[in-house]
Amino acid sequence: MKGIQCKLARVALGWGVIELASRAKVSTQTITRLERGDQLRPSTLESIQSVLEEAGIEFIKENGGGIGVRFRDPD
């Protein structure tokens, strides 16, 4: 997950930085650092990504059209 994907997912869910940080059990500074492109520990990234995926976000890998996020199909 890239920082821009985190921000897009967070905004799509209507969450602020505080909400995501609380759910992922990380500091707001950690979310801010990720969203501006800083490197985080893999375990921290996994924690944040897991929370977003559990909320229904699917991460789109770079496939020629660029990276992104979308809501997972509930089926």
Q: Which stretches of residues belong to each language-model region?
A:
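Short basic helix-loop element that most often maps to the first helix and adjoining turn
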Residues: C6-E19
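Append "Primarily bacterial transcriptional regulators
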Residues: L20-A21, V69
